[in-house]
Amino acid sequence: MTLQQEIIQALGAKPHINPEEEIRRSVDFLKAYLKTYPFLKSLVLGISGGQDSTLAGKLSQMAIAELREETGDNALQFIAVRLPYGVQADEQDCQDAIAFIQPDRVLTVNIKGAVLASEQALREAGIELSDFVRGNEKARERMKAQYSIAGMTHGVVVGTDHAAEAITGFFTKYGDGGTDINPLHRLNKRQGKQLLAALGCPEHLYKKVPTADLEDDRPSLPDEAALGVTYDNIDDYLEGKTLDPAIAKTIEGWYVKTEHKRRLPITVFDDFWKK
């Protein structure tokens, strides 16, 4: 088995999907989890205005609405959380995403004060954060807020990770990578667009340039610029297509060096890191 085949198998990626079937699969998956643990009453997700959180948010709201109708449990709710750092440049996209999702509840937690306070506390301890590390601080602060909300609403935190993100490890460890349940796992980027199109999402929300937008020195830095490959390259790789060797090597390089992000904390029984 080639490394490409191993990666495809590990991430559950498929070359072709039926969008309607995958929508139903994700919604039923979320519902089944909540039904298994009836003490859980909410799904919590940060909404950024980008493709991934818009899709995960819509699927979460659909799952909650269906489960509420089926069980009569009106305590069930989907909580969409806005988590800007100060003023977000693409705030209108966030509002458009909220309008499309129509969540049961919307909360806004501005993380700037908490991030600056943490940075100052570290500075007083003799640690000056780089812009890159400060970006990770933002991602972790966002997740901390979501877990606090979930803790107070008997909820679980929904993740936005998918195959095209997992393969490169393009997420913050214990930030946006630290979630309870990931309904998009297995899908590549273009497949996520297919699901949103099938759901009637406004096109600008899934055709916009993907960006983590974490670094102050490089605001709105496109994911593809940071990775050195395009999402079309990554999707083609995940669909089993043959790529230019240099591009394939870059993708596989990301996969190998970010393996630790896709695993639980390393123990004496692990040996993947010895490769």
UniProtKB/Swiss-Prot annotation:
Q: Name one Pfam family in it.
A: NAD_synthase
**Which residues of the sequence carry a binding annotation for deamido-NAD(+)?**
R140, K173, D180, H260, K261
Q: Where does Mg(2+) bind?
A: D52, E165
Which reaction(s) does the protein catalyse, per the Swiss-Prot or TrEMBL entry?
deamido-NAD(+) + NH4(+) + ATP = AMP + diphosphate + NAD(+) + H(+)
Q: Which domain of life, per UniProt?
A: Bacteria
EC code(s) of this entry: 6.3.1.5
- Which key words tag this protein in UniProt? ATP-binding, Ligase, Magnesium, Metal-binding, NAD, Nucleotide-binding
Q: Does the keyword NAD apply?
A: yes
Q: Name one GO cellular component term.
A: cytoplasm
Q: Broadest EC class?
A: ligase
**What family classification does the UniProt entry report for this protein?**
Belongs to the NAD synthetase family.
Oligomeric state and partners?
Homodimer.
Q: What is this protein called?
A: NH(3)-dependent NAD(+) synthetase
Which gene carries the instructions for this protein? Answer: nadE
